[in-house]
Amino acid sequence: MLDIKFLRTNFEEVKAKLQHRGEDLTDFGRFEELDTRRRELLVQTEELKSKRNEVSQQISVLKREKKDAEALILEMREVGEKVKDFDNELRTVEEDLERLMLSIPNIPHESAPVGETEDDNVVARTWGEVKEFTFEPKPHWDLATDLGILDFERAGKVTGSRFVFYKGAGARLERALISFMLDLHTDEHGYEEVLPPYMVNRASMTGTGQLPKFEEDAFRIESEDYFLIPTAEVPVTNMHRDEILNKEQLPIRYAAFSSCFRSEAGSAGRDTRGLIRQHQFNKVELVKFVKPEDSYEELEKLTNDAERVLQLLELPYRVMSMCTGDLGFTAAKKYDIEVWIPSYGTYREISSCSNFEAFQARRANIRFRREPNGKPEHVHTLNGSGLAIGRTVAAILENYQQEDGTIIIPEVLRPYMGGKTVIK
């Protein structure tokens, strides 16, 4: 959520920056109308309440003096009715203003490339050499099915499309990657491990920006009004909702493994085979709470931490600086890390690393004090995938495949695979 005072005094500037996102600003124009009316109602209501108090005191004086107070009593009733009407209108205006504020996306950072679509994203850097195969490489779903380590067909029978059973060495590889990533981020990068709940309430989804705008993309448990988490970002960020932290606690860095659940409502017909787009998948998420002046340095560190996973796995990748039209709703700046997938003949996203500045913290009321008695300020929050496990499995299967259909296990994972070197 944006700062309402900043928006009030910089309305045209904010509007111009949001236009770079390609947003429909039809409703945005109502801000000035609602904000002005709200302030008018606050003034009018306070004036009437003050008058009501004065009249009430006058009535008390007249009654003590045994004088007729009927006219003032009638006047106070009329004032009371007006106060009630103004309070009702104020409540409606504030609810409308709150809904509008929750629907306004974050302001892009000045360093984000200006553009409309993914075609305008900018390559920040690449790492590793794309392997030249001496044979026609197979897609990971064919490799895994032939090896008996992934079963899409039976998962479709048990649940439906976009689900999978991991079996044997496939399940072991998934588990190995989870342990490897958590060990790397906690032992070498300084994150604290968290295992979060997989269901959250509506306030949590609102705090991180999934609600109210993207409710159709979420899996909701209607009987409880809980939501299955689309990412560990939601529960982990909301750990500190409605809290005031001390300066000495910052930065806070969490690494959280979780399963993630997404409806993929807008992805019909895309990536219908394999692990790239599943309704349920595992991920290691990195979440940070930092002082505002440190957040862009921390974004670079977070992105480097996610990149390190791919470097140790020796998987070629590139880092994209996302343009203003492809930032998503909550990010002020975002990098996508894309890993090379041979069957696609291109790079595919495996991590998004974002700085939300105070956008989430304002929604979730997460603040800190620089001094013990100082005025609370909003922290800046960041998060990034470190990494998506299923897509990492897909990248390993395809990049490490051999002509006979076997898979070489990356050296860094072998201790987690019982010393095994090949999946066959």
Curated annotation (Swiss-Prot):
A Gene Ontology biological process term: seryl-tRNA aminoacylation
UniProt entry tagged with the keyword Protease: no
Gene Ontology CC, one term: cytoplasm
Pathway stated in the Swiss-Prot or TrEMBL entry: Aminoacyl-tRNA biosynthesis; selenocysteinyl-tRNA(Sec) biosynthesis; L-seryl-tRNA(Sec) from L-serine and tRNA(Sec): step 1/1
Location of this chain's protein in the cell: Cytoplasm
Protein residues bound to L-serine: 231-233, 285, 385
SUPFAM superfamilies the record matches: Class II aaRS and biotin synthetases, tRNA-binding arm
InterPro entries: aa-tRNA-synt_IIb, aa-tRNA-synth_II, aa-tRNA-synth_II/BPL/LPL, Ser-tRNA-ligase_type_1, Ser-tRNA-synth_1_N, SerRS_1_N_sf, SerRS_core, tRNA-bd_arm
EC number per UniProt: 6.1.1.11
Entry keywords, A to Z: Aminoacyl-tRNA synthetase, ATP-binding, Cytoplasm, Ligase, Nucleotide-binding, Protein biosynthesis
Source taxon at top rank: Bacteria
Known partners and oligomeric status: Homodimer. The tRNA molecule binds across the dimer.
Xref: HAMAP family: Ser_tRNA_synth_type1 (MF_00176)
PANTHER family from the UniProt entry: SERINE--TRNA LIGASE (PTHR43697:SF1), SERYL-TRNA SYNTHETASE (PTHR43697)
Protein name from the UniProt record: Serine--tRNA ligase
Organism: Bacillus cereus (strain G9842)
Source organism phylogeny: Bacteria, Bacillati, Bacillota, Bacilli, Bacillales
